C-alpha cells in the first residue's frame, strides 16, 4: 500500500507556472506620432554648465505657456 501512495505523490506535485513571455516589438508595430507639437529647441550650448538649471526652468515655463495641456508639467524631478 505504501508503494501506491508513493506513486500517487509523484503525480500530485505542483507544477511551476509557465513564465509569460513579453511580446517583442518590431518597427512594423510602431506608427507615426499622432499629436506631436514641436515646442522648442535646446542646443548643447544652451544647457551649459553655468546657467543650465536656470535655463531648464525657463524652458519648462515656455512649454507650459505653449498650449493648454491636460497634464501639467512636473517639477518634481531635480536635474
From Swiss-Prot:
Lipid moiety-binding residues (S-palmitoyl cysteine): 10-11
UniProt membrane topology term: Lipid-anchor
Compartment(s): Cytoplasm, Cytoskeleton; Cell membrane
Gene Ontology process terms (BP): phagocytosis; regulation of cell shape; regulation of Rho protein signal transduction
GO molecular function term, any single one: small GTPase binding
Record-level GO cellular component terms: cell junction; cytoplasm; cytoskeleton; plasma membrane
Annotated ranges, domain CRIB: 30-43
Coiled coil: none
Protein's job: Probably involved in the organization of the actin cytoskeleton by acting downstream of CDC42, inducing actin filament assembly. Alters CDC42-induced cell shape changes. In activated T-cells, may play a role in CDC42-mediated F-actin accumulation at the immunological synapse. May play a role in early contractile events in phagocytosis in macrophages.
Domain notes from UniProt: The CRIB domain mediates interaction with CDC42.
Protein name, as recorded: CDC42 small effector protein 1
Gene label: Cdc42se1
Amino acid at each position: 500500500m505504501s508503494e501506491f501512495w508513493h506513486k500517487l505523490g509523484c503525480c500530485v506535485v505542483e507544477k511551476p507556472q509557465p513564465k509569460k513571455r513579453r511580446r517583442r516589438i518590431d518597427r512594423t508595430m510602431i506608427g507615426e506620432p499622432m499629436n506631436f507639437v514641436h515646442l522648442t529647441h535646446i542646443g548643447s550650448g544652451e544647457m551649459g554648465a553655468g546657467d543650465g538649471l536656470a535655463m531648464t526652468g525657463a524652458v519648462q515655463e515656455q512649454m507650459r505657456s505653449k498650449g493648454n495641456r491636460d497634464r501639467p508639467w512636473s517639477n518634481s524631478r531635480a536635474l
